[in-house]
């Protein structure tokens, strides 16, 4: 006997459905056994027989109310059913609920919105019996998809009316269809209604799918209707309930179907898709879990797991199981709140209830087991990166990218999510109690020794002062109590038994307070397990019992664990040592100091070391952290900063190899050690000769020296080179006053030679300035300007100020040297302009390549590095020379230096960008050329000669004007150095902006 459900008009029912809507949908369990027995007599049609051939494709009735109406629909659990049919129904229902996360609602298969609106209109009209058509391959005996598409021509509305009229005659328990035509005419205009409202009407008015199929096929067989009429009546029914994602044609096959506007269902418009969308979940739960093909559509109800023998046939892609587990948990809690309330406390996405063998929880479990087995040994030596959860500077690490000039090489290597565990935490793992088998996470929660934290021990002492008292009366009572037993142990015949009993008494020892009441044992931590234990002797394998064999196996596992931890500690120490050696090498060989912190950070990221770096001039503070124990190890890397272009190139090559995982750390450490121990390319005596050659080459083009001044400058330059390479290197005390003493010696000799024949043959200013050109602070100015550009204010300000003070030292030495010779010779010359300078400018530029080559060789550059250095230096000098020829620019030192530095920066950036070389090494000689040229334009290096003349003159009377001029003359050289520094800095900034307008530099100017 069929069950009927009364309903009102469509308009009124839709309003009631909206009012009675509940946000949490409960899907009750269904008892279909009795209902099937009642309908067994009427299910003899061909369509029912075809339905029986399907395996486990039993339909499920969805009630039109959340509360049970009769005994057929019950909220009781399906496990209480006794019949075999009910058990099959139970498996199917629970299987559907458990497999909800495995359905795919692919976003790229969703059709146009007008189709979805038409589906909603059909749902709202209440035509649950005849507005759906089954897919063509749902029943194998019904024909192919091409036949169905060919038979779909005709008036679909009239077919639907005939089907409804026949259902009214046969099924008396169904609802009255008097308003069928009016509701059907309204169905196409209801597309703009709320989808949730249409879903409620669909859920409240659904009947058993199998019942509809049986009664509809019986009417069609009696009236001998065509196959097209039958397929048209059921296609829309089951495509709303089909659990299989079918591929429908994207457009109607003919013009008649286009006129009818037959909607093609999207995967999100199926019944289960609408139910899932009501729970706040968008789309499907497992996108891309199944594959589709137009040639052959698979019945996924059979493949997903409704048959025991075919439970693993679904083809899955790589999924995010944690996210799917959370979605499945939300669905269960939304649709089955009773079951969700029975979940144990602390259930997470990793611990799902085992609903069926094909549920997503099994997939998560299997994936986690395989992943844990593969990475179990590696995970114990890793800790989370403190940059994510302690320091919180991951989002702020690229703030420097706001400045266009900065190198964005930091973005190439992201900070790792996990870093290598520190040395201290690894040592704690090595010496902790192996029997407890606690993981490394126990270091943050519970103490390894004793099982209690220090806070628990301190709380115990405060809560129970009697137990923490220093006067332990319980020991005295126990001595009296156990005294006879201990005396009995001394009997010769009871030695073994007494020892055993004594150990049992000690293990079962009780503690009492002063009143004699028994109290708990004092909760004191034990450190006896922290000592390393000697391995026990292992007997032969054939004579070992099973229990002893297990102990030996456990002992071997512990030994393997200790070996792994020991190797890990050695590896961590090796990596940390490599980082400090790399830092020392970069500082010693003259790497750009403004990049040291970033390069050290990149190296630590690649090596998975938690390292923090802070640079100060002459010192690098290195901190290696241990996130497990919240400790850090701080090192100070201090070294005398020098300049060695060849070794700097080798260090850069080693650094690049480690960064790009081309060179292992062991081999890189060995190469660094060899590089640090390696001798310089050129001997000190050769460098002294190059000093003299460079001094002679700079004299003509920078300080307007004559041909006679070249050999004199060569000899004086040899003296300066000898003082620097031999005297200063052997005496730390003299190295502090090297600049002053060198300037004194050079000025004294130059004034003595220039005074011959009143300066007719030799130029005093050219000889003095040319000999001091190689010790001018050109490199200090370059590094200081780069640090200021990179917003490293501390180091940049210190270097720039040091360059100014260094220049004042030189000026003071020049004044003192000139005064010393003035006291010796009263006829000493004081002119600062040369009479016999080279007039042809074409000859002056020939000395620039030679001076650049001497600078490169003095700084230990390779011969193959000299060509690019010479080209850049010559181009920069040409710009400075012609800028100085202009009348308006001749007196503006900072502008001429800016033009020269701009040209040098452009060529250096282009060389770095095209040739992938070191821009700083190529630019360094060119910057050295710019500094003497800028100083010579003002002739401020000899500004102290006027003060020297006043010191040696007989007139001791001075005025305020002369005092002011003296003070201005003494500071003139420092002011000139400031102007040159500003011009060089601005020129380098502008050149970087010109070559890298978007700020992206892989091996640009400010990288190595």
Curated annotation (Swiss-Prot):
Keyword Membrane: yes
Gene Ontology terms, MF aspect: transmembrane transporter activity
Membrane topology: Multi-pass membrane protein
A GO-annotated cellular component: membrane
Stretches with biased composition (Basic and acidic residues): 162-186, 205-214, 226-239
Keyword vocabulary terms for this entry: Membrane, Transmembrane, Transmembrane helix
Compositionally biased intervals (Acidic residues): 116-132, 143-161
Ranges of biased composition (kind: Low complexity): 70-85, 215-225
Residue spans of biased composition, Polar residues class: 95-111, 188-204, 346-364
Location(s), subcellular: Membrane
Spans traversing the lipid bilayer: 683-703, 707-727, 736-756, 762-782, 800-820, 838-858, 866-886, 892-912, 917-937, 978-998
Region span, Disordered: 1-273, 342-384, 477-506
Start-end of Basic residues biased regions: 483-498
UniProt-listed InterPro entries: ThrE-like_N, ThrE/Ser_Exporter, ThrE_2
PANTHER family linked: PHEROMONE-REGULATED MEMBRANE PROTEIN 10
Family: Belongs to the ThrE exporter (TC 2.A.79) family.
Name of the protein this chain belongs to: Pheromone-regulated membrane protein 10
Organism: Debaryomyces hansenii (strain ATCC 36239 / CBS 767 / BCRC 21394 / JCM 1990 / NBRC 0083 / IGC 2968)
Source lineage: Eukaryota, Fungi, Dikarya, Ascomycota, Saccharomycotina
């Amino acid at each position: 006997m069929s069950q009927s459900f009364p309903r009102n008009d469509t308009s009124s029912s839709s309003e009631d459905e909206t009012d009675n809507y509940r946000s949490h949908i409960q899907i009750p369990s269904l008892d279909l056994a009795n209902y099937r027995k009642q309908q067994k007599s009427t299910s003899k049609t061909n369509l029912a027989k075809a339905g029986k051939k399907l395996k486990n494709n039993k339909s499920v009735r969805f009630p039109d109310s959340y509360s049970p109406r009769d005994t057929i629909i019950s909220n009781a659990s399906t496990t209480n059913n006794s019949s075999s049919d009910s058990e099959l129904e139970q498996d199917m229902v629970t299987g559907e609920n458990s497999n909800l996360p495995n359905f795919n609602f692919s976003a790229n298969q969703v059709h146009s919105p007008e189709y979805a609106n038409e589906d909603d209109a059909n749902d709202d009209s209440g035509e649950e019996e005849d507005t759906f058509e089954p897919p063509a391959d749902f029943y194998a005996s019904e024909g192919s998809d091409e036949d169905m598409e060919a038979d779909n021509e005709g008036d679909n509305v009239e077919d639907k009316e005939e089907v409804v009229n026949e259902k009214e005659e046969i099924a008396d328990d169904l609802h009255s269809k008097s308003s069928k035509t009016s509701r059907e005419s309204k169905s196409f205009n209801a597309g703009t209604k709320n989808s949730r409202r249409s879903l409620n009407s669909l859920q409240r008015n659904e009947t058993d799918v199998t019942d509809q199929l049986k009664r509809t096929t019986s009417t069609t067989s009696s009236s001998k209707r065509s196959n097209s009429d039958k397929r048209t009546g059921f296609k829309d029914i089951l495509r709303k309930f089909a659990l299989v994602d079918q591929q429908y044609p994207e457009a109607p096959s003919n013009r008649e179907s286009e006129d009818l506007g037959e909607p093609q269902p999207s995967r999100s418009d199926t019944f289960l898709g609408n139910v899932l969308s009501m729970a706040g979940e968008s789309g499907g739960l497992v996108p891309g879990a199944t594959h589709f093909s137009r040639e052959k559509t698979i019945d996924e109800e059979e493949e997903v797991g409704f048959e025991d023998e075919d439970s693993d046939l679904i083809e899955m892609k790589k999924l995010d199981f944690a996210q799917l587990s959370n979605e499945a948990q939300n669905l269960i809690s939304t649709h089955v709140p009773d079951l969700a309330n029975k979940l144990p406390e602390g259930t997470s996405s990793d611990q799902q209830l085992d609903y069926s063998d094909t549920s997503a929880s099994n997939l998560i479990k299997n994936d986690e087991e395989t992943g844990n087995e593969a990475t179990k040994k590696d995970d114990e030596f890793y800790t989370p990166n403190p940059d994510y959860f302690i320091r919180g500077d991951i989002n702020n690490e690229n703030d420097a990218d706001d400045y266009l000039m900065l190198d964005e090489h930091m973005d190439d290597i992201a900070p790792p999510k996990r870093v290598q565990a520190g040395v201290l935490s690894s040592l704690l793992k090595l010496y902790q109690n192996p029997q407890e088998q606690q993981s490394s996470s126990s270091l943050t929660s519970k103490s390894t020794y004793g099982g209690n934290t220090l806070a628990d021990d301190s709380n115990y002492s405060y809560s129970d002062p009697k137990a923490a008292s220093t006067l332990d009366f319980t020991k005295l009572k126990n001595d009296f109590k156990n005294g006879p037993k201990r005396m009995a142990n001394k009997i010769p015949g009871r030695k073994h038994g007494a020892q055993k009993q004594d150990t049992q008494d000690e293990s079962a020892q009780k503690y009492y307070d002063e009143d004699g009441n028994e109290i708990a044992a004092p909760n004191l931590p034990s450190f006896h397990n922290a000592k390393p234990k000697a391995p026990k002797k292992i007997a032969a394998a054939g004579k070992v019992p099973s229990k002893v064999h297990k102990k030996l196996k456990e002992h071997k596992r512990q030994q393997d664990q200790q070996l792994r931890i020991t190797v890990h500690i050695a590896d961590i120490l090796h990596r940390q040592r490599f980082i400090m050696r790399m830092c020392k090498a970069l500082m010693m060989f003259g790497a750009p100091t403004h990049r040291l912190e970033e390069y050290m950070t990149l190296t630590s990221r690649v090596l998975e070391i938690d390292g923090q770096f802070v640079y100060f001039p002459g010192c690098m503070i290195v901190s290696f952290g241990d996130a497990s124990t919240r400790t850090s190890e701080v090192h100070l890397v201090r070294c005398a900063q020098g300049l060695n272009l060849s070794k700097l190139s080798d260090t850069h090559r080693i650094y690049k190899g480690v960064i790009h995982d081309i060179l292992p750390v062991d081999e890189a450490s060995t190469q660094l050690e060899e590089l640090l121990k390696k001798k310089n390319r050129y001997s000190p005596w050769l460098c002294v000769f190059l000093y003299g050659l460079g001094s002679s080459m700079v004299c003509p083009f920078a300080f307007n020296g004559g041909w006679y001044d070249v050999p004199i400058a060569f000899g004086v330059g040899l003296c300066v080179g000898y003082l620097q390479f031999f005297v200063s290197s052997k005496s730390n005390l003299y190295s502090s006053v090297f600049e002053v003493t060198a300037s004194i010696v050079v000025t004294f000799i130059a004034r003595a030679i220039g005074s011959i024949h009143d300066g007719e043959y030799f130029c005093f200013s050219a000889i003095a300035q040319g000999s001091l050109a190689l010790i001018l602070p050109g490199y200090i100015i370059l590094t200081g300007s780069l640090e200021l550009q990179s917003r490293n204010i501390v180091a940049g300000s210190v270097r720039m100020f040091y360059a100014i003070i260094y220049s004042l030292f030189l000026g003071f030495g020049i004044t003192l040297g000139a005064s010393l010779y003035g006291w010796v010779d009263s006829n000493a010359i004081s002119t600062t302009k040369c009479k016999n300078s080279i007039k042809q400018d074409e000859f002056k530029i020939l000395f620039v390549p030679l001076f650049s080559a001497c600078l490169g060789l003095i700084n230990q550059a390779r011969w193959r590095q000299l060509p690019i250095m010479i080209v850049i230096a010559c181009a920069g000098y040409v710009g400075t020379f012609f800028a100085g020829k202009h009348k308006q620019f001749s007196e503006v030192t900072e502008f001429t230096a800016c033009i020269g530095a701009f040209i040098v920066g452009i060529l250096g950036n282009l060389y770095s960008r095209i040739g992938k070389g070191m821009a700083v090494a190529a630019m360094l000689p060119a910057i050295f050329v710019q500094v003497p040229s800028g100083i010579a334009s003002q002739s401020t290096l000899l500004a102290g000669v006027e003060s020297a003349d006043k010191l040696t003159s007989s007139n001791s009377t001075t005025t305020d004007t002369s005092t002011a001029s003296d003070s201005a003359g003494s500071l003139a050289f420092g002011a000139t150095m400031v102007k040159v520094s500003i011009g060089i800095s601005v020129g380098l900034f502008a050149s970087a902006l010109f070559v890298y307008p978007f700020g992206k530099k892989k091996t640009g100017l400010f990288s190595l």
